[in-house]
Amino acid sequence: MSKRRMSVGQQTWALLCKNCLKKWRMKRQTLLEWLFSFLLVLFLYLFFSNLHQVHDTPQMSSMDLGRVDSFNDTNYVIAFAPESKTTQEIMNKVASAPFLKGRTIMGWPDEKSMDELDLNYSIDAVRVIFTDTFSYHLKFSWGHRIPMMKEHRDHSAHCQAVNEKMKCEGSEFWEKGFVAFQAAINAAIIEIATNHSVMEQLMSVTGVHMKILPFVAQGGVATDFFIFFCIISFSTFIYYVSVNVTQERQYITSLMTMMGLRESAFWLSWGLMYAGFILIMATLMALIVKSAQIVVLTGFVMVFTLFLLYGLSLITLAFLMSVLIKKPFLTGLVVFLLIVFWGILGFPALYTRLPAFLEWTLCLLSPFAFTVGMAQLIHLDYDVNSNAHLDSSQNPYLIIATLFMLVFDTLLYLVLTLYFDKILPAEYGHRCSPLFFLKSCFWFQHGRANHVVLENETDSDPTPNDCFEPVSPEFCGKEAIRIKNLKKEYAGKCERVEALKGVVFDIYEGQITALLGHSGAGKTTLLNILSGLSVPTSGSVTVYNHTLSRMADIENISKFTGFCPQSNVQFGFLTVKENLRLFAKIKGILPHEVEKEVQRVVQELEMENIQDILAQNLSGGQNRKLTFGIAILGDPQVLLLDEPTAGLDPLSRHRIWNLLKEGKSDRVILFSTQFIDEADILADRKVFISNGKLKCAGSSLFLKKKWGIGYHLSLHLNERCDPESITSLVKQHISDAKLTAQSEEKLVYILPLERTNKFPELYRDLDRCSNQGIEDYGVSITTLNEVFLKLEGKSTIDESDIGIWGQLQTDGAKDIGSLVELEQVLSSFHETRKTISGVALWRQQVCAIAKVRFLKLKKERKSLWTILLLFGISFIPQLLEHLFYESYQKSYPWELSPNTYFLSPGQQPQDPLTHLLVINKTGSTIDNFLHSLRRQNIAIEVDAFGTRNGTDDPSYNGAIIVSGDEKDHRFSIACNTKRLNCFPVLLDVISNGLLGIFNSSEHIQTDRSTFFEEHMDYEYGYRSNTFFWIPMAASFTPYIAMSSIGDYKKKAHSQLRISGLYPSAYWFGQALVDVSLYFLILLLMQIMDYIFSPEEIIFIIQNLLIQILCSIGYVSSLVFLTYVISFIFRNGRKNSGIWSFFFLIVVIFSIVATDLNEYGFLGLFFGTMLIPPFTLIGSLFIFSEISPDSMDYLGASESEIVYLALLIPYLHFLIFLFILRCLEMNCRKKLMRKDPVFRISPRSNAIFPNPEEPEGEEEDIQMERMRTVNAMAVRDFDETPVIIASCLRKEYAGKKKNCFSKRKKKIATRNVSFCVKKGEVIGLLGHNGAGKSTTIKMITGDTKPTAGQVILKGSGGGEPLGFLGYCPQENALWPNLTVRQHLEVYAAVKGLRKGDAMIAITRLVDALKLQDQLKAPVKTLSEGIKRKLCFVLSILGNPSVVLLDEPSTGMDPEGQQQMWQVIRATFRNTERGALLTTHYMAEAEAVCDRVAIMVSGRLRCIGSIQHLKSKFGKDYLLEMKLKNLAQMEPLHAEILRLFPQAAQQERFSSLMVYKLPVEDVRPLSQAFFKLEIVKQSFDLEEYSLSQSTLEQVFLELSKEQELGDLEEDFDPSVKWKLLLQEEP
C-alpha cells in the first residue's frame, strides 16, 4: 500500500487544475459565460457613455427671483370646485390680485365635471380644488407650471446651466405662477377668516435662491439603470458557478470525500478560479464606471474594491445556495433572482436616508450592500466639494463600513455553507447534529487504542447452521471487517423501509468475498455503509479495528480503502490519465509518486491505448474500467467493489479477475455482482443476501452440493437419432435421471450428484452409440445461478445448454401456466385484425406523437419556468408604462408640509431636516410673528439683529427674512436649491404666521397636484410596446420546439423510426402541441398588451382577425424553423438559451435596420419577407403604415398589400416544411414505410459487390454462407428466413494522422453472411469493436452497408415489413411517461387499432406481470422493469423480425431468468426470428439456438452451443474437496499421474482445482472411472468434472482480435452503457 498524506494544498491545486481544464475543454459553456459578460460590459460602455449625463456644477452666488406678483402670464384660465358660497367668496377676492386682473375664473360643482375644460379650452387651465375653507390643492396639467418630480433625488441635478444661465427646478414654482396663485388664495382665505387684508403683504414677498455650492449630479433614470446592470454584472459567472458546484456536489463530491477529499479544498478550488474571473470583471466594471463618469470624485481603487468584494460575496452566496438547493438549474435561477431582488431592495438608498438599524441589517444581503455602496459613491459626488478628492483628503467612513459589510457577508455565507453542508441530510455521507460545533470532539482529536474490543466480539459470525460453511482454520484471526447486527432503514412513502435487517458476518483478509442477491436485497446499501458513504441505523462495523461510527476513524479508513461504486466516478472532460492523476492527489498519494502510481494502474488494466482519450468519449465498459482503476490507486488494503465489471466485455472482465486474484493476499476484497458466474469463478466465499438478511455463505462447491440440481448431460444429435431409445439408455444406468430439454438437435438430462459412480458405465455406452445419431455429448456441473434461484424459491432454467422447455416440464404449474399464457398472447396477434396503414395510420401516429409531446411538456418544469419568466420579462416595460400612465392620469396630491424640510421643536438633528432660519431686519421685535411660527410646530433659529443675509449659508433648507416695521411686515424667502418644494412650503408658513398674528387658530394647507391630458398621440407608444414584446415572443420558440433533440439523444426517435413511424407524422405531431402552445402564449401576450394599453392604442389595429391570422402563420413558420435547426444540430446540445438569444437579437436588429433603412416602406416589406423571426412585427408595421405612397411602391391596393403581408408567414412555413422534408430524405436512415405526406419511400435493397473474397474460413462459416445464398434464391416466401445478411461490409473514414496524410479506411465488418430462420434466436457475440453494433445498425437501417445486402422478411416479397421489433441496449424511453403511456404510443405508431392495442397490451402486461407498474413513470422503475418494458415494446404488434441488444443487461439473476424464459417463449415455434447480441455468455447459452462469434469484423464461428464447445473447447475443470488435509500432497501426485497435463488453478484449505486438457479427459467414461477410484482411495468429500464453458471458448477466439481494430471502441456511436441496479 502506497504511503498517503492528505494535504489541503495538494487537493486544492489538483481540483483547481481540474476546473481550469473544464473551462478550457468545455469551450461552448466558457464562451457563453464570458460572451454574455463582455456583451454586458460593451453595452454599458457604448450605451451609457453616450446616454449618461454628468452635471458638474460650480459654485454660484444667490439668485433673486423678484416679487410674487411679478408673474404676468395671461395664457390660462382658472377653475375651482366645488362651487359654494364660501369658495365663490374666496375666489372673488382672489380675482383682486394684481396679476389676475381680467382673468376668467369659473366655478364647477365637482372636480370630475372639470374634464370638460379640455374640450372647451385650448389654453392651460389652473384648477383649484377645495377640501375645506382652509385646505385646497392646486392642480396643473402634468409637466406644466410645476416640476414633474415630487421631490429632488439625492443624486439628480437640481440646477443646471440653460442658455448660459443657471436654472433651478425649484424656481418653476415662482416663475410660472404656482406661488402667485398660492399667495392670492391664502390672502383671500385670511381676509375672509380675520377681516384683515394681507394681499399686499403676500404679493410683495420676494424669493431668493441661496448660494449654490459646487456639486456633481447624475443623469436621473440612466444612473438607476446603470446601477441595476452593475448589480447583475456578475450574474453570468455566478449562475455557472452555482450550476457547476451543485452538479459536482450532487453526483461526485460525496464519493470524493469518502476517498479523503477535504471539504475546504473543494470550496477553495471553485472559489479561487471564479475569484480570478471576478477580478477581471471587477477591473472592467470599475473602468466603465470611471470612464462613463458614474462616479467622478472617488478613485479607481475604491470602486474596484467595491466590485471585487461584491463579486466574492456572490460566489459564497452561490456556494450557500448550492448546499440548500439540490437541483443545478434551480440553484442558478434562485441565486440570480436573489441578486436582482436584493439589489433592487437597495434602490431607496439612492433617494433617501434609510434608518441606520434597517440599513445595517439589510446589508447582510450583499446585493443590497453593494447598491448602498454605489449610492454612497454617487452621494459623495453630489455632496462633496468638487476640488476635494476622496482618496486624498476625505475619510470615507460610510464606504469603508459598506466594504466591511461585504467582507462580513462573504465570511458569513461561507460559514453558513460549511455549517449547512454538515447538518443537512444528503443521499450519501455522515450528517452532524445542528450543535456539532459545541462538542469537544469537533475541536480536538482524541487518541484511541490500537485495538477496539467490541462487546461479544467473538460472537460476530452468524449463528452456525448447515446454510453457512465453517471458515477454514487458516483464516481464524484474520477477520478484517467485522459486521455486527447491522441495520439500515430508509424513509418510504408510507412507512420505513428496512434495507438491512441485523446483518452479522466477518470478512477475512486473504479472501475474495462476493455479495450476491436480487435487486434490492441490500448489497449496495451494505457496501455504501462499509465505505462510509452511508450511516447505519443501528449496529456496528469495524475495519481493521477502526470503528465506522467515528469521524476520525472514517478518515483513517479512507486512507487504506478503495471503493468502486455502482455509478462511474470520473470527470468526462478529463482524459483517463488526468482522471487517475486527479484522484491520486485527492487520495493523498505523495506528489513524487503520483505519476508512477498512475502509470502502474494504466499498465495493469491495459489502458495505454486510451490513456489520452477524454472519459466522455470512452465506451461504457472503458469508463467502468477507469472507475475500477481509480479504486485501486494507492494499492489499498481494503477493496470494496460494487459490480466492478458491469458492462465490460469478457476479455476485459477476465483481466480484472486475474488482477484481483493476484492481489488478494494480505488484502480484503469484497464485491457485489449480478453476474453469478463472476462470483463462481472469482470469489473464494459467496455470501447470499435476501431482503436485507443473510441467507447462506460458503464456497462454490459447498453451495452447489447443498442446493445444486446435479450434472447436465447434453447430447448433440443428427436426424438418425431416436430420442426415446437414448432416454431409455440413460435411465437404464441412472433411473432418476430427468429429460429437461428436447429439440431436433439436442437432448439434455439432469443427472443427480450422488450418482457419479454410475457415470463411467453410462458414458461408455454413449461412446458406443455413435451409430444411433449421437454426434457429440458433454457434461457440466450445476451452476451458481441455479443455486441462487433455488435459494430465492424460483424455478430455474439451465444456462449451460439445457434449453428451457424440458426444464419447464419439471417445474411447478405456475411457471408453465405463465409461459403458456405468454405463448397464447403472442399467437393471438395473428388473430387480430390487420394493422392500419396509409393516411389513417399517419393520423393515428400524429395523435400519438402529440400525446407524447404534451405529456413531456407537462413534466418539463425547467422549460415551463423559463417560458413563464420570459413571459413576465416581456411585459415589464408595458407594466411600468401602465403604472406610469395610471399614476399620472389620476390626480395625486402632494402635501406641502414644513415637516418635510424643518425640524420640530426638541427633535434631534436629522438629515436632511434643519432649523428654519428667521432673520429680523425690521429694527424692532417680531415676537408675535415668531410665536405664530412656533405654533406651527417648527424649530426656528432667530437672528434677532439681522446680521446675516440668509442667502449665503446653504446649511439651512430655508430662511425667512422679515423687514418693514413692527406692524407692517415685509417678507423675503430664501430657499436651498436642493429642496424642490421649499418656496410653496415657506409661503404657507408665512401665511399661517400672519393668520396666527390675527389670533386665528386655523391652519392653511396647500397641496400640489396634477391631472393628465387625454389627447396624446399614441402611435409611437404602440410601436414602442410592440418593439419589446414581439421580439421577446420570438425568443420563446427554442424553449418550446426543440424537444426533438432530447428524443435523438435518448435514441427514442430512432426507436420510433424502426417501429414504423412516418417522419412527417413525427414533426406534425410535435407541431400540434408546440404550435398550439406558442399561439396561446402569443394570444395571451396580445391580450395583455390590450389590457395594459390605453383605449386609444387598441383602436389603431382596426382588424383583429387579420392580426390573429398573421399570428397563426408566424407561429407555424417559426416552430418549423426551429425544427429545422433542431434537426441540423440533433447530435449536439439543446442550447435553447443560445437560440432564444439569437432570435431576440435578430428581431431587434431587424427593427432597427428597417427603421433606419433609406427605402422606407419597401425596405420594411422586404425585411418582413426575408427575416422569418421579424415577420410578425414587420406585418403589423406594414398594416399600420399603409399609405398611398406605399401602394405606389408595390403597385397594389391596400387590401392586396394586407393579403400579401398576411401570406408571408405561411410562405415561410411551406419553405421550412420543404427543407425539413429534404433533410429527412437525405439523412440516410432507412424507412419502414412510405411516408404519405413527405412522399419519402423506403430505399430499395441495393446490392453492392464486396471487394474481398472470403479466405481461410471455417467450414461452419462456409456452410452458413451457402445457406444464405440458397435462401436468397428461394422464391417460396413462406420458406424465406426472417433475416438474411449477405456479404455485409462496412467501411468508415478513419482519422488523418496529419494534414498531409490520407484518411485510412476503418473496416468495421468484412463479408459477414448469416441468416435467421423462423422460430430461431441467433446470438451474435464479440469483443468490443468486433463489429456487432455495426451489423445491428445495418439491419435496422441506421447505417448503409458499403457492400452486401440485408433482406428482412416482408421486404423481399409478400406484404411490406412495416416495422421491426428492436430492444436496444440503452433504454430508449421517456423518463416522465408511464409504462401504459409507452405501450399505447408504440401500439399506435405500429398501426394497431385502439381495440386491438388494448387487448394486446392487457395480455402482455398480464403475462409479464407488469400490472403494478402500469401507472408508474419510467424514471421510478428498476432496471429490470425497464428492460422488460423495452422487450415488450419490441414484440408489440407481432413483428416478424426482432433485434435484441443486451436484453437482460443490468438485471439480477432472477430477472434474467424471467427474461430468458420470455424470449424463448416469444420465438419458439413461431413465424418470428431474432438476432441477439450480448456480452453475457450465460444469456447466449440460455436462449440462443445458435451462436455466431465475431472477431475483427469477421464471423469466426457459428453453430449450436454444444457444437462450439466440442469444437473449440480445450479444457475440462476438475474440483475436489478433501476431508483429510493430510491427503493433499498424495492426491496432487495422483492427479498428475492420471492426467499428466493437468494444471493446478487453486489450492487453499481443503479445495483443489485443476484444468484438464480435452485429450486427457476423453473418453469421459474413463475420466469418471479414474475419478471414482480416486474418490474411494482418498476419501474425497466431493468432486466435479465440468466441460469448458462458452465463455472460455469465446475468450480463446477473442485473443485473435487485432489491436488496430479496437479503434471502434473510441467511436462515440459504439458504447456499452453501464446499467445500474436500484437498491435501497
Swiss-Prot record:
Residues 481-716, 1288-1521 form the ABC transporter domain. Keywords: ATP-binding, Glycoprotein, Membrane, Nucleotide-binding, Repeat, Translocase, Transmembrane, Transmembrane helix, Transport. ATP 1 binds at G517, H518, S519, G520, A521, G522, K523, T524. It is a multi-pass membrane protein. Induction: Up-regulated during monocyte differentiation into macrophages. Down-regulated by cholesterol loading of macrophages. It holds the Pfam family ABC2_membrane_3. GO terms for molecular function: ABC-type transporter activity; ATP binding; ATP hydrolysis activity; ATPase-coupled transmembrane transporter activity; lipid transporter activity. Widely expressed with higher expression in heart. The keyword Glycoprotein applies. GO terms for biological process: lipid transport. CDD domains: ABC_subfamily_A. One of its GO terms (cellular component) is intracellular membrane-bounded organelle. The keyword RNA-binding does not apply. PROSITE patterns: ABC_TRANSPORTER_2 (PS50893). Glycans are attached at N120, N195, N949. ATP 2 binds at G1326, H1327, N1328, G1329, A1330, G1331, K1332, S1333. It is found in: Membrane. The chain crosses the membrane at residues 31-51, 221-243, 269-289, 300-320, 329-349, 354-374, 398-418, 864-884, 1026-1046, 1065-1085, 1108-1128, 1136-1156, 1163-1183, 1200-1220. Its EC number is 7.6.2.-. Transporter that may play a role in monocyte differentiation and lipid transport and homeostasis. Belongs to the ABC transporter superfamily. ABCA family. This is ATP-binding cassette sub-family A member 9. The gene is ABCA9.
